[in-house]
Amino acid sequence: MEEQTGTETNLGKKKRSNIFLWIVAVLITIISIFYQNTTGPTYPQKGHVVFNGKQIDYKLDRSALINQDCPVKIYINDSTIKGSLIWKRFNTRDNESSKPMRYENGYLVSELDKQDKMAAKLQYYIQLSSSQPGSQNEIHEYIPDKSGVVIRFRGDVPFMVIIFHILFIFSFELLSLKTGMEFFRKEPKYKAYTFWTIGLAAVGGLILGPLVQYYAFGEFWTGFPFGFDLTDNKMIIAFAAWIVALIALYKSKKPGYWVLGATILTIVIFLIPHSVLSGNVPK
């Protein structure tokens, strides 16, 4: 009877330990999702400036669809403030182009002209102008500044392709975390978790990832050996790390260290903002 009770107690401890590790893995994954959703070169640049004695908040897009104008607007609620939208092609010696912004319902509004090339990039900013009371001189402010914001134009990716890509990629991160955490259990179950981790990485990163890139930029793969796309390269590095960990499960006397190493490398990779050095494939 005492032996049975002891066995049940051990099983309960193992179950609680497993649940705890799953909770930690889920929390880290959620934090990672939030981090990826607020960093990187494709998410809107937010901030504020103080002009004419008032704070003006802005949110400037850094990603837009090809073949349609990209709206640019900021809320100022002051019809005496004038605005100009200024832009040029990114990384060129082109002269800047400029057009006045319209005042509509408290907003200064304009548009960046549509682009017909995938991965085309424009560098743009807004110039605010206002006359000083009792003076003919104008004061100016630049949003965000004269160096501007770089916006990249892409093709339209089917909704379900995006959804499944995101689902598989973050499931890969979740499983990689849980697999690595098995290192801290007395009876780790590396093998099944490692196979699941590799499968999710293959589908999310090596099948759906290139498909997303093809729809967005017209190329399936622009990482090694064809280019320097960091999103592609970090995915292939993570996948290779888990293949090495899988081999270690059969060949190494201490495979747990290889699994833990693959997990740590995966975490580091997910700390790199999404789309850095990506989509540089203009036609």
Describe the function of each predicted region:
Residues 2-170, 176-188, 252-263, 267:
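Glycan-association/targeting regions that enable binding to alpha-glucans and other polysaccharides
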Residues 167-178, 234-249:
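Hydrophobic cores of alpha-helical transmembrane segments in multi-pass inner/ER membrane proteins
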Residues 201-210, 264-274:
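Aromatic-anchored segments of alpha-helical transmembrane domains
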Residues 271-283:
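Juxtamembrane boundary at the C-terminal end of a transmembrane helix
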Residues 158-164, 219-232:
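Non-cytosolic membrane-interface motifs at loop->transmembrane helix junctions
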Residues 187-202, 259:
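Interfacial segments of alpha-helical transmembrane regions
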Residues 70, 176-181, 206-213, 242-245:
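Canonical alpha-helical transmembrane segments
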Residues 210-222, 275-277:
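Juxtamembrane "helix-exit" motif on the non-cytosolic side of transmembrane helices
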